[in-house]
Amino acid sequence: MGAMGAAEPLHSVLWVKRRRCAVSLEPARALLRWWRSPEPGPSAPGADARSVLVSEIIAVEEKDDCEKHASSGRWHKMENPFAFTVHRVKRVRHHRWKWARVTFWSADEQLCHLWLQTLRGLLESLTSRPKHLLVFINPFGGKGQGKRIYEKTVAPLFTLASITTEIIITEHANQAKETLYEINTDSYDGIVCVGGDGMFSEVLHGVIGRTQQSAGIDPNHPRAVLVPSTLRIGIIPAGSTDCVCYSTVGTNDAETSALHIIIGDSLAIDVSSVHYHNTLLRYSVSLLGYGFYGDLIKDSEKKRWMGLVRYDFSGLKTFLSHQYYEGTLSFLPAQHTVGSPRDNKPCRAGCFVCRQSKQQLEEEEKKALYGLENAEEMEEWQVTCGKFLAINATNMSCACPRSPGGLSPFAHLGDGSSDLILIRKCSRFNFLRFLIRHTNQEDQFDFTFVEVYRVKKFHFTSKHVEDEDNDSKEQEKQKFGKICKDRPSCTCSASRSSWNCDGEVMHSPAIEVRVHCQLVRLFARGIEEES
Protein backbone atom coordinates (compact mmCIF):
# COMPACT_ATOMS: atom_id res chain seq x y z
CA MET A 1 0.00 0.00 0.00
CA GLY A 2 3.00 2.33 0.10
CA ALA A 3 2.24 5.60 1.90
CA MET A 4 -1.39 4.68 2.53
CA GLY A 5 -0.91 4.21 6.25
CA ALA A 6 0.65 7.70 6.65
CA ALA A 7 -2.47 9.63 5.59
CA GLU A 8 -4.79 10.97 8.27
CA PRO A 9 -8.33 9.58 8.58
CA LEU A 10 -11.07 11.75 7.10
CA HIS A 11 -14.61 12.10 8.45
CA SER A 12 -17.13 14.43 6.83
CA VAL A 13 -20.81 14.92 6.16
CA LEU A 14 -21.44 14.94 2.41
CA TRP A 15 -24.42 14.45 0.14
CA VAL A 16 -25.03 11.30 -1.93
CA LYS A 17 -28.10 11.13 -4.21
CA ARG A 18 -29.75 14.03 -2.36
CA ARG A 19 -29.25 12.32 1.01
CA ARG A 20 -27.03 13.52 3.82
CA CYS A 21 -24.35 10.91 4.50
CA ALA A 22 -21.50 10.45 6.91
CA VAL A 23 -18.36 9.61 4.93
CA SER A 24 -15.16 8.20 6.40
CA LEU A 25 -11.79 7.28 4.96
CA GLU A 26 -9.55 5.09 7.07
CA PRO A 27 -6.11 4.85 5.42
CA ALA A 28 -4.92 2.27 7.95
CA ARG A 29 -7.69 -0.08 6.80
CA ALA A 30 -7.58 1.25 3.22
CA LEU A 31 -11.36 1.61 3.38
CA LEU A 32 -13.82 4.26 2.19
CA ARG A 33 -17.26 4.05 3.87
CA TRP A 34 -20.47 6.05 3.74
CA TRP A 35 -23.87 5.74 5.40
CA ARG A 36 -27.03 7.81 5.85
CA SER A 37 -26.84 10.47 8.55
CA PRO A 38 -30.19 12.27 8.89
CA GLU A 39 -28.80 14.68 11.48
CA PRO A 40 -25.83 17.03 10.92
CA GLY A 41 -23.86 15.61 13.86
CA PRO A 42 -21.74 12.43 14.07
CA SER A 43 -23.50 9.10 13.55
CA ALA A 44 -22.56 5.43 13.66
CA PRO A 45 -22.75 3.25 10.53
CA GLY A 46 -25.93 1.20 10.25
CA ALA A 47 -27.03 -1.75 8.15
CA ASP A 48 -27.24 0.50 5.09
CA ALA A 49 -23.53 1.42 5.24
CA ARG A 50 -21.63 1.06 1.96
CA SER A 51 -17.89 0.60 1.60
CA VAL A 52 -15.15 0.09 -0.95
CA LEU A 53 -11.52 -0.83 -0.52
CA VAL A 54 -9.18 1.88 -1.75
CA SER A 55 -7.43 -0.81 -3.80
CA GLU A 56 -10.71 -1.36 -5.68
CA ILE A 57 -11.27 2.28 -6.57
CA ILE A 58 -10.72 2.71 -10.31
CA ALA A 59 -10.37 6.50 -10.38
CA VAL A 60 -11.52 9.69 -8.65
CA GLU A 61 -12.78 12.57 -10.78
CA GLU A 62 -13.62 16.16 -9.95
CA LYS A 63 -17.16 17.13 -10.92
CA ASP A 64 -17.36 20.79 -11.89
CA ASP A 65 -20.96 21.20 -12.92
CA CYS A 66 -24.10 20.74 -10.88
CA GLU A 67 -26.21 17.98 -12.37
CA LYS A 68 -29.90 18.66 -12.84
CA HIS A 69 -31.31 16.16 -10.38
CA ALA A 70 -34.89 16.26 -9.18
CA SER A 71 -34.03 17.74 -5.79
CA SER A 72 -35.62 18.05 -2.40
CA GLY A 73 -36.13 21.38 -0.68
CA ARG A 74 -32.97 20.85 1.33
CA TRP A 75 -30.92 20.46 -1.84
CA HIS A 76 -31.93 23.91 -3.06
CA LYS A 77 -30.56 25.46 0.12
CA MET A 78 -27.03 24.33 -0.86
CA GLU A 79 -25.29 27.18 -2.65
CA ASN A 80 -22.70 26.53 -5.38
CA PRO A 81 -22.35 22.77 -4.76
CA PHE A 82 -19.02 21.09 -5.49
CA ALA A 83 -18.56 17.38 -6.07
CA PHE A 84 -16.20 14.50 -6.78
CA THR A 85 -17.00 11.07 -8.23
CA VAL A 86 -15.48 7.80 -7.07
CA HIS A 87 -15.39 5.11 -9.78
CA ARG A 88 -15.20 1.70 -8.17
CA VAL A 89 -15.52 -2.05 -8.52
CA LYS A 90 -18.91 -3.51 -7.68
CA ARG A 91 -19.34 -7.24 -7.19
CA VAL A 92 -22.36 -8.92 -8.72
CA ARG A 93 -23.38 -12.57 -8.96
CA HIS A 94 -21.24 -15.46 -10.21
CA HIS A 95 -17.86 -13.75 -9.63
CA ARG A 96 -18.64 -10.92 -12.04
CA TRP A 97 -17.42 -7.39 -11.41
CA LYS A 98 -19.03 -4.23 -12.71
CA TRP A 99 -17.92 -0.63 -12.97
CA ALA A 100 -19.95 1.55 -10.59
CA ARG A 101 -19.68 5.13 -9.41
CA VAL A 102 -20.84 7.27 -6.52
CA THR A 103 -20.78 11.08 -6.46
CA PHE A 104 -20.26 13.02 -3.23
CA TRP A 105 -21.50 16.63 -3.02
CA SER A 106 -20.72 19.49 -0.67
CA ALA A 107 -21.11 23.27 -0.48
CA ASP A 108 -17.52 23.49 0.79
CA GLU A 109 -15.09 23.63 -2.15
CA GLN A 110 -12.03 23.17 0.07
CA LEU A 111 -13.55 20.08 1.67
CA CYS A 112 -14.21 18.53 -1.74
CA HIS A 113 -10.68 19.37 -2.84
CA LEU A 114 -9.25 17.74 0.31
CA TRP A 115 -11.15 14.51 -0.35
CA LEU A 116 -10.16 14.54 -4.00
CA GLN A 117 -6.46 15.03 -3.30
CA THR A 118 -6.37 12.50 -0.46
CA LEU A 119 -8.02 9.75 -2.49
CA ARG A 120 -5.86 10.44 -5.53
CA GLY A 121 -2.75 10.34 -3.36
CA LEU A 122 -3.73 6.94 -2.01
CA LEU A 123 -4.35 5.61 -5.53
CA GLU A 124 -0.95 6.87 -6.69
CA SER A 125 0.69 4.95 -3.85
CA LEU A 126 -0.65 1.66 -5.25
CA THR A 127 2.49 0.63 -7.14
CA SER A 128 1.05 -2.65 -8.45
CA ARG A 129 -1.25 -0.87 -10.90
CA PRO A 130 -0.26 -0.87 -14.58
CA LYS A 131 0.22 2.44 -16.35
CA HIS A 132 1.28 1.32 -19.84
CA LEU A 133 0.11 -1.89 -21.53
CA LEU A 134 0.75 -3.71 -24.79
CA VAL A 135 -2.53 -5.10 -26.15
CA PHE A 136 -2.85 -7.89 -28.72
CA ILE A 137 -6.29 -8.29 -30.29
CA ASN A 138 -7.27 -11.40 -32.24
CA PRO A 139 -10.01 -10.19 -34.62
CA PHE A 140 -10.80 -13.70 -35.87
CA GLY A 141 -11.16 -15.79 -32.69
CA GLY A 142 -14.48 -17.00 -31.31
CA LYS A 143 -17.29 -15.13 -33.01
CA GLY A 144 -14.93 -12.49 -34.36
CA GLN A 145 -15.95 -10.00 -31.67
CA GLY A 146 -12.54 -9.32 -30.12
CA LYS A 147 -12.05 -5.83 -31.57
CA ARG A 148 -15.62 -4.77 -30.75
CA ILE A 149 -15.39 -6.10 -27.18
CA TYR A 150 -12.15 -4.21 -26.59
CA GLU A 151 -13.38 -0.91 -28.07
CA LYS A 152 -16.80 -0.99 -26.42
CA THR A 153 -16.04 -2.47 -22.99
CA VAL A 154 -12.33 -2.40 -22.19
CA ALA A 155 -10.86 0.74 -23.79
CA PRO A 156 -13.21 3.19 -21.96
CA LEU A 157 -12.27 1.63 -18.61
CA PHE A 158 -8.55 1.82 -19.38
CA THR A 159 -8.98 5.49 -20.32
CA LEU A 160 -10.88 6.17 -17.10
CA ALA A 161 -8.02 4.60 -15.12
CA SER A 162 -5.42 6.67 -17.04
CA ILE A 163 -3.83 3.55 -18.54
CA THR A 164 -2.08 4.14 -21.86
CA THR A 165 -1.93 1.35 -24.41
CA GLU A 166 -0.26 0.25 -27.60
CA ILE A 167 -2.56 -1.94 -29.66
CA ILE A 168 -1.59 -4.62 -32.17
CA ILE A 169 -4.37 -6.31 -34.14
CA THR A 170 -2.94 -9.66 -35.16
CA GLU A 171 -3.12 -10.73 -38.79
CA HIS A 172 -1.71 -14.24 -38.65
CA ALA A 173 -1.02 -17.09 -36.23
CA ASN A 174 1.92 -16.67 -33.82
CA GLN A 175 2.23 -12.94 -34.55
CA ALA A 176 1.95 -12.10 -30.86
CA LYS A 177 4.63 -14.64 -29.94
CA GLU A 178 6.98 -13.39 -32.66
CA THR A 179 6.43 -9.76 -31.67
CA LEU A 180 7.30 -10.42 -28.03
CA TYR A 181 10.59 -12.01 -29.11
CA GLU A 182 11.48 -8.98 -31.24
CA ILE A 183 10.46 -5.87 -29.28
CA ASN A 184 11.78 -4.30 -26.08
CA THR A 185 9.16 -4.98 -23.41
CA ASP A 186 10.82 -2.95 -20.64
CA SER A 187 8.46 0.00 -21.10
CA TYR A 188 5.32 -2.09 -20.52
CA ASP A 189 3.74 -2.97 -17.20
CA GLY A 190 1.97 -5.95 -18.71
CA ILE A 191 0.72 -7.69 -21.83
CA VAL A 192 -3.01 -7.98 -22.55
CA CYS A 193 -4.47 -10.49 -24.98
CA VAL A 194 -7.98 -10.10 -26.35
CA GLY A 195 -9.14 -13.49 -27.60
CA GLY A 196 -9.48 -17.08 -26.47
CA ASP A 197 -7.15 -19.68 -25.04
CA GLY A 198 -5.22 -19.86 -28.32
CA MET A 199 -4.39 -16.16 -28.18
CA PHE A 200 -3.35 -16.46 -24.55
CA SER A 201 -1.10 -19.41 -25.42
CA GLU A 202 0.68 -17.30 -28.05
CA VAL A 203 1.37 -14.53 -25.54
CA LEU A 204 2.38 -17.07 -22.88
CA HIS A 205 4.95 -18.67 -25.20
CA GLY A 206 6.25 -15.24 -26.19
CA VAL A 207 6.62 -14.02 -22.61
CA ILE A 208 8.26 -17.22 -21.31
CA GLY A 209 10.48 -17.63 -24.37
CA ARG A 210 11.67 -14.02 -24.30
CA THR A 211 12.42 -14.26 -20.57
CA GLN A 212 14.52 -17.44 -20.98
CA GLN A 213 16.32 -15.94 -23.97
CA SER A 214 17.28 -12.85 -21.94
CA ALA A 215 18.43 -15.03 -19.03
CA GLY A 216 20.51 -17.33 -21.24
CA ILE A 217 18.41 -20.39 -20.40
CA ASP A 218 18.09 -23.19 -22.96
CA PRO A 219 14.37 -24.15 -22.89
CA ASN A 220 15.07 -27.30 -24.91
CA HIS A 221 16.75 -28.88 -21.90
CA PRO A 222 14.05 -30.84 -20.02
CA ARG A 223 15.74 -30.24 -16.65
CA ALA A 224 16.32 -26.51 -17.18
CA VAL A 225 15.19 -24.31 -14.28
CA LEU A 226 13.11 -21.66 -16.00
CA VAL A 227 13.20 -18.01 -14.89
CA PRO A 228 9.84 -16.44 -13.97
CA SER A 229 8.82 -13.39 -15.98
CA THR A 230 8.17 -10.06 -14.32
CA LEU A 231 5.55 -9.17 -16.96
CA ARG A 232 1.98 -9.93 -16.02
CA ILE A 233 -0.49 -11.17 -18.62
CA GLY A 234 -4.07 -9.96 -18.77
CA ILE A 235 -6.80 -11.96 -20.51
CA ILE A 236 -9.84 -10.29 -22.05
CA PRO A 237 -12.06 -13.28 -22.97
CA ALA A 238 -13.27 -13.14 -26.56
CA GLY A 239 -12.70 -16.64 -27.90
CA SER A 240 -14.49 -19.89 -28.49
CA THR A 241 -12.92 -21.27 -25.32
CA ASP A 242 -11.90 -19.13 -22.35
CA CYS A 243 -10.83 -21.88 -19.97
CA VAL A 244 -7.83 -20.06 -18.46
CA CYS A 245 -9.83 -16.92 -17.77
CA TYR A 246 -12.75 -18.85 -16.26
CA SER A 247 -10.45 -20.94 -14.04
CA THR A 248 -8.50 -17.94 -12.70
CA VAL A 249 -11.27 -15.33 -12.38
CA GLY A 250 -14.44 -17.41 -12.08
CA THR A 251 -16.18 -15.99 -15.14
CA ASN A 252 -15.53 -15.24 -18.80
CA ASP A 253 -16.77 -11.65 -18.62
CA ALA A 254 -14.68 -8.99 -20.39
CA GLU A 255 -15.56 -6.17 -17.99
CA THR A 256 -14.58 -8.28 -14.98
CA SER A 257 -11.21 -9.11 -16.53
CA ALA A 258 -10.57 -5.46 -17.44
CA LEU A 259 -11.21 -4.40 -13.84
CA HIS A 260 -8.79 -7.01 -12.49
CA ILE A 261 -6.15 -5.56 -14.83
CA ILE A 262 -6.88 -1.97 -13.79
CA ILE A 263 -6.56 -2.56 -10.06
CA GLY A 264 -3.33 -4.48 -10.62
CA ASP A 265 -4.26 -7.91 -9.34
CA SER A 266 -1.49 -10.50 -9.53
CA LEU A 267 -1.74 -14.29 -9.55
CA ALA A 268 1.16 -16.69 -10.11
CA ILE A 269 0.24 -19.89 -11.96
CA ASP A 270 2.04 -23.10 -12.82
CA VAL A 271 3.24 -23.89 -16.34
CA SER A 272 4.14 -27.32 -17.71
CA SER A 273 6.92 -27.73 -20.25
CA VAL A 274 6.44 -30.52 -22.80
CA HIS A 275 9.56 -32.07 -24.36
CA TYR A 276 10.39 -34.82 -26.82
CA HIS A 277 14.00 -35.94 -27.40
CA ASN A 278 15.51 -32.82 -25.78
CA THR A 279 13.31 -30.51 -27.83
CA LEU A 280 10.71 -28.19 -26.32
CA LEU A 281 7.36 -28.84 -27.99
CA ARG A 282 5.05 -26.47 -26.11
CA TYR A 283 4.10 -25.00 -22.76
CA SER A 284 0.78 -25.86 -21.15
CA VAL A 285 -1.20 -24.16 -18.39
CA SER A 286 -4.60 -25.85 -18.61
CA LEU A 287 -5.15 -29.20 -20.37
CA LEU A 288 -2.74 -31.67 -21.85
CA GLY A 289 -4.98 -34.42 -23.19
CA TYR A 290 -4.32 -37.61 -25.15
CA GLY A 291 -6.98 -39.91 -26.54
CA PHE A 292 -10.51 -38.49 -26.29
CA TYR A 293 -9.62 -34.80 -26.00
CA GLY A 294 -6.74 -35.12 -28.45
CA ASP A 295 -8.94 -36.75 -31.08
CA LEU A 296 -11.69 -34.21 -30.45
CA ILE A 297 -9.48 -31.16 -31.03
CA LYS A 298 -7.81 -32.74 -34.06
CA ASP A 299 -11.17 -33.45 -35.70
CA SER A 300 -12.57 -30.00 -34.83
CA GLU A 301 -9.63 -28.28 -36.55
CA LYS A 302 -10.85 -29.70 -39.86
CA LYS A 303 -14.30 -28.21 -39.28
CA ARG A 304 -13.57 -24.58 -38.43
CA TRP A 305 -16.11 -23.58 -41.07
CA MET A 306 -18.81 -24.90 -38.71
CA GLY A 307 -18.04 -22.26 -36.07
CA LEU A 308 -18.39 -23.06 -32.38
CA VAL A 309 -20.76 -25.96 -33.03
CA ARG A 310 -17.76 -27.91 -34.35
CA TYR A 311 -16.78 -28.80 -30.79
CA ASP A 312 -20.15 -30.45 -30.14
CA PHE A 313 -20.04 -32.28 -33.47
CA SER A 314 -16.46 -33.50 -33.02
CA GLY A 315 -17.17 -34.42 -29.41
CA LEU A 316 -20.08 -36.64 -30.42
CA LYS A 317 -18.10 -38.19 -33.26
CA THR A 318 -15.14 -38.93 -30.98
CA PHE A 319 -17.40 -40.38 -28.30
CA LEU A 320 -19.10 -42.71 -30.78
CA SER A 321 -15.76 -43.92 -32.19
CA HIS A 322 -14.81 -45.03 -28.65
CA GLN A 323 -11.16 -45.35 -29.60
CA TYR A 324 -8.61 -46.38 -27.01
CA TYR A 325 -4.82 -46.23 -27.09
CA GLU A 326 -2.07 -48.28 -25.51
CA GLY A 327 0.99 -46.85 -23.83
CA THR A 328 3.16 -46.56 -20.74
CA LEU A 329 3.13 -43.76 -18.18
CA SER A 330 5.77 -43.07 -15.56
CA PHE A 331 5.20 -40.26 -13.09
CA LEU A 332 6.76 -38.61 -10.07
CA PRO A 333 4.15 -38.01 -7.34
CA ALA A 334 3.99 -34.47 -5.94
CA GLN A 335 5.12 -35.16 -2.37
CA HIS A 336 5.59 -31.45 -1.63
CA THR A 337 1.96 -30.38 -1.94
CA VAL A 338 -0.42 -30.42 1.02
CA GLY A 339 -3.46 -31.14 -1.16
CA SER A 340 -4.81 -34.06 -3.16
CA PRO A 341 -7.09 -34.32 -6.22
CA ARG A 342 -10.08 -35.53 -4.17
CA ASP A 343 -9.76 -33.51 -0.95
CA ASN A 344 -12.77 -31.25 -1.66
CA LYS A 345 -10.58 -28.16 -1.26
CA PRO A 346 -10.90 -25.99 -4.38
CA CYS A 347 -8.27 -23.40 -5.23
CA ARG A 348 -9.50 -19.95 -4.19
CA ALA A 349 -8.08 -16.44 -3.90
CA GLY A 350 -5.23 -16.39 -1.37
CA CYS A 351 -5.02 -20.19 -1.55
CA PHE A 352 -3.28 -21.81 1.44
CA VAL A 353 -2.36 -24.94 -0.53
CA CYS A 354 -0.57 -22.91 -3.23
CA ARG A 355 1.34 -20.84 -0.64
CA GLN A 356 2.45 -23.84 1.38
CA SER A 357 3.38 -25.90 -1.67
CA LYS A 358 5.49 -23.07 -3.07
CA GLN A 359 7.35 -22.72 0.24
CA GLN A 360 7.96 -26.47 0.41
CA LEU A 361 9.36 -26.52 -3.14
CA GLU A 362 11.67 -23.61 -2.34
CA GLU A 363 12.99 -25.51 0.69
CA GLU A 364 13.66 -28.57 -1.48
CA GLU A 365 15.49 -26.42 -4.05
CA LYS A 366 17.69 -24.88 -1.34
CA LYS A 367 18.66 -28.32 -0.03
CA ALA A 368 19.48 -29.51 -3.53
CA LEU A 369 21.49 -26.32 -4.18
CA TYR A 370 23.69 -26.92 -1.13
CA GLY A 371 24.01 -30.61 -1.94
CA LEU A 372 22.17 -31.75 1.16
CA GLU A 373 19.78 -33.95 -0.80
CA ASN A 374 18.14 -34.30 -4.17
CA ALA A 375 14.40 -34.71 -3.64
CA GLU A 376 13.84 -36.15 -7.10
CA GLU A 377 16.43 -38.88 -6.57
CA MET A 378 14.93 -39.78 -3.19
CA GLU A 379 11.38 -40.01 -4.52
CA GLU A 380 10.26 -43.04 -6.47
CA TRP A 381 8.76 -42.90 -9.92
CA GLN A 382 5.61 -44.93 -10.45
CA VAL A 383 4.92 -46.77 -13.69
CA THR A 384 1.62 -47.88 -15.18
CA CYS A 385 0.62 -49.13 -18.59
CA GLY A 386 -2.51 -50.29 -20.35
CA LYS A 387 -5.27 -49.28 -22.70
CA PHE A 388 -6.62 -45.77 -22.20
CA LEU A 389 -9.63 -43.91 -23.56
CA ALA A 390 -8.11 -40.67 -22.31
CA ILE A 391 -5.04 -39.37 -20.51
CA ASN A 392 -5.49 -35.86 -19.11
CA ALA A 393 -3.04 -33.66 -17.23
CA THR A 394 -4.51 -30.46 -15.79
CA ASN A 395 -2.65 -27.61 -14.10
CA MET A 396 -5.96 -25.99 -13.16
CA SER A 397 -9.56 -27.05 -12.80
CA CYS A 398 -10.26 -26.32 -16.50
CA ALA A 399 -13.68 -25.01 -15.50
CA CYS A 400 -16.01 -23.44 -18.06
CA PRO A 401 -19.71 -22.49 -18.21
CA ARG A 402 -20.66 -25.99 -19.36
CA SER A 403 -18.55 -27.65 -16.69
CA PRO A 404 -18.39 -25.32 -13.66
CA GLY A 405 -16.24 -27.78 -11.72
CA GLY A 406 -13.98 -28.58 -14.65
CA LEU A 407 -11.93 -31.67 -15.43
CA SER A 408 -10.33 -31.66 -11.98
CA PRO A 409 -12.37 -29.51 -9.58
CA PHE A 410 -9.73 -29.45 -6.84
CA ALA A 411 -6.64 -28.80 -8.97
CA HIS A 412 -4.59 -25.82 -7.83
CA LEU A 413 -3.28 -22.92 -9.87
CA GLY A 414 0.10 -22.51 -8.21
CA ASP A 415 1.04 -25.59 -6.18
CA GLY A 416 3.73 -26.85 -8.56
CA SER A 417 1.79 -29.94 -9.58
CA SER A 418 -0.52 -31.32 -12.23
CA ASP A 419 -3.47 -33.65 -11.79
CA LEU A 420 -2.88 -36.70 -13.98
CA ILE A 421 -6.20 -38.36 -14.85
CA LEU A 422 -6.21 -41.80 -16.46
CA ILE A 423 -9.42 -43.16 -17.98
CA ARG A 424 -8.84 -46.79 -18.77
CA LYS A 425 -10.71 -48.82 -21.35
CA CYS A 426 -14.36 -49.21 -20.36
CA SER A 427 -17.77 -49.54 -21.98
CA ARG A 428 -19.19 -46.64 -23.95
CA PHE A 429 -22.00 -46.36 -21.38
CA ASN A 430 -19.58 -46.04 -18.47
CA PHE A 431 -17.52 -43.46 -20.33
CA LEU A 432 -20.72 -41.46 -20.90
CA ARG A 433 -21.43 -41.62 -17.16
CA PHE A 434 -17.93 -40.28 -16.54
CA LEU A 435 -18.43 -37.37 -18.97
CA ILE A 436 -21.85 -36.46 -17.55
CA ARG A 437 -20.37 -36.08 -14.08
CA HIS A 438 -18.35 -33.11 -15.36
CA THR A 439 -21.62 -31.17 -15.59
CA ASN A 440 -22.94 -31.89 -12.09
CA GLN A 441 -21.71 -32.08 -8.50
CA GLU A 442 -20.91 -35.81 -8.47
CA ASP A 443 -17.33 -37.07 -8.16
CA GLN A 444 -16.12 -37.89 -11.67
CA PHE A 445 -13.19 -39.84 -10.22
CA ASP A 446 -15.43 -42.31 -8.39
CA PHE A 447 -15.17 -45.06 -11.01
CA THR A 448 -13.07 -48.22 -11.02
CA PHE A 449 -11.72 -47.35 -14.48
CA VAL A 450 -10.59 -43.83 -13.48
CA GLU A 451 -7.34 -43.06 -11.66
CA VAL A 452 -6.08 -39.63 -10.61
CA TYR A 453 -2.65 -38.68 -9.29
CA ARG A 454 -1.10 -35.36 -8.30
CA VAL A 455 2.31 -35.26 -10.00
CA LYS A 456 5.14 -32.87 -10.73
CA LYS A 457 6.60 -34.82 -13.65
CA PHE A 458 5.45 -37.54 -16.01
CA HIS A 459 6.55 -39.34 -19.17
CA PHE A 460 4.32 -41.03 -21.72
CA THR A 461 5.28 -43.40 -24.52
CA SER A 462 2.74 -44.86 -26.91
CA LYS A 463 2.81 -48.59 -27.64
CA HIS A 464 3.86 -47.87 -31.23
CA VAL A 465 7.08 -46.22 -30.07
CA GLU A 466 7.77 -49.09 -27.69
CA ASP A 467 7.27 -51.57 -30.52
CA GLU A 468 9.46 -49.61 -32.92
CA ASP A 469 12.23 -49.46 -30.32
CA ASN A 470 12.09 -53.19 -29.75
CA ASP A 471 12.72 -55.21 -32.90
CA SER A 472 12.07 -58.44 -31.07
CA LYS A 473 8.39 -57.58 -30.98
CA GLU A 474 8.05 -57.42 -34.75
CA GLN A 475 6.55 -60.89 -35.08
CA GLU A 476 4.12 -60.20 -32.25
CA LYS A 477 3.01 -57.02 -34.00
CA GLN A 478 2.36 -58.88 -37.23
CA LYS A 479 0.39 -61.52 -35.32
CA PHE A 480 -1.58 -58.76 -33.56
CA GLY A 481 -2.38 -57.10 -36.88
CA LYS A 482 -3.46 -60.41 -38.44
CA ILE A 483 -5.90 -61.06 -35.58
CA CYS A 484 -7.47 -57.64 -36.07
CA LYS A 485 -7.65 -58.12 -39.83
CA ASP A 486 -9.33 -61.50 -39.42
CA ARG A 487 -11.90 -59.98 -37.04
CA PRO A 488 -13.38 -56.80 -38.55
CA SER A 489 -15.48 -56.23 -35.42
CA CYS A 490 -12.35 -55.87 -33.28
CA THR A 491 -12.06 -52.35 -31.80
CA CYS A 492 -8.34 -52.60 -31.03
CA SER A 493 -6.47 -49.36 -31.57
CA ALA A 494 -4.18 -49.62 -34.58
CA SER A 495 -3.20 -45.94 -34.57
CA ARG A 496 -1.95 -43.35 -32.13
CA SER A 497 -3.75 -40.27 -30.90
CA SER A 498 -2.73 -36.62 -30.91
CA TRP A 499 -2.27 -34.35 -27.91
CA ASN A 500 -4.61 -31.51 -27.04
CA CYS A 501 -2.24 -28.92 -25.57
CA ASP A 502 -4.33 -25.98 -24.33
CA GLY A 503 -6.62 -26.31 -27.33
CA GLU A 504 -3.86 -26.77 -29.91
CA VAL A 505 -3.09 -30.03 -31.72
CA MET A 506 0.32 -31.50 -30.89
CA HIS A 507 1.68 -34.62 -32.59
CA SER A 508 4.18 -36.59 -30.55
CA PRO A 509 4.26 -40.33 -29.81
CA ALA A 510 6.20 -39.75 -26.60
CA ILE A 511 6.50 -36.76 -24.29
CA GLU A 512 8.25 -35.66 -21.12
CA VAL A 513 6.31 -33.19 -18.95
CA ARG A 514 7.55 -31.11 -16.04
CA VAL A 515 5.58 -28.62 -13.92
CA HIS A 516 7.26 -25.26 -13.21
CA CYS A 517 5.78 -23.77 -10.05
CA GLN A 518 4.27 -20.28 -10.42
CA LEU A 519 6.27 -19.48 -13.55
CA VAL A 520 4.02 -16.72 -14.92
CA ARG A 521 1.78 -14.07 -13.41
CA LEU A 522 -1.67 -13.01 -14.55
CA PHE A 523 -3.74 -9.93 -13.84
CA ALA A 524 -6.09 -12.00 -11.66
CA ARG A 525 -6.50 -13.01 -8.02
CA GLY A 526 -8.04 -16.47 -8.23
CA ILE A 527 -11.70 -17.28 -7.74
CA GLU A 528 -13.14 -15.50 -4.70
CA GLU A 529 -15.43 -17.19 -2.21
CA GLU A 530 -18.93 -15.84 -2.72
CA SER A 531 -20.78 -14.72 0.40
Swiss-Prot record:
Which residues constitute the catalytic centre?
197
> Catalytic activity annotated for this protein?
an N-acylsphing-4-enine + ATP = an N-acylsphing-4-enine 1-phosphate + ADP + H(+); N-(hexanoyl)sphing-4-enine + ATP = N-hexanoylsphing-4-enine 1-phosphate + ADP + H(+); N-(acetyl)-sphing-4-enine + ATP = N-(acetyl)-sphing-4-enine-1-phosphate + ADP + H(+); N-hexadecanoylsphing-4-enine + ATP = N-(hexadecanoyl)-sphing-4-enine-1-phosphate + ADP + H(+)
GO terms under cellular component: membrane; mitochondrion; plasma membrane
Q: Say if the entry is tagged with keyword ATP-binding.
A: yes
Q: In which tissues is it expressed?
A: High level expression in heart, brain, testis and pancreas; low expression in spleen, liver and lung; not detected in skeletal muscle.
Residues bound to ATP: 138-140, 170-174, 202, 239-241, 304, 310, 502-504
The residues that hold substrate are 195-198
Q: Where is this region: Essential for enzyme activity?
A: 1-115
What SUPFAM superfamilies does this protein's entry cite?
NAD kinase/diacylglycerol kinase-like
Q: Where is the signal peptide?
A: none
Q: What are the subcellular locations of this protein? A: Cytoplasm; Cell membrane
- Membrane topology (UniProt): Peripheral membrane protein
Query: Which superkingdom, per the lineage?
Result: Eukaryota
What is one Pfam family matched by this protein? PH_CERK
> What's its job?
Catalyzes specifically the phosphorylation of ceramide to form ceramide 1-phosphate. Acts efficiently on natural and analog ceramides (C6, C8, C16 ceramides, and C8-dihydroceramide), to a lesser extent on C2-ceramide and C6-dihydroceramide, but not on other lipids, such as various sphingosines. Shows a greater preference for D-erythro isomer of ceramides. Binds phosphoinositides.
What protein name applies here?
A: Ceramide kinase
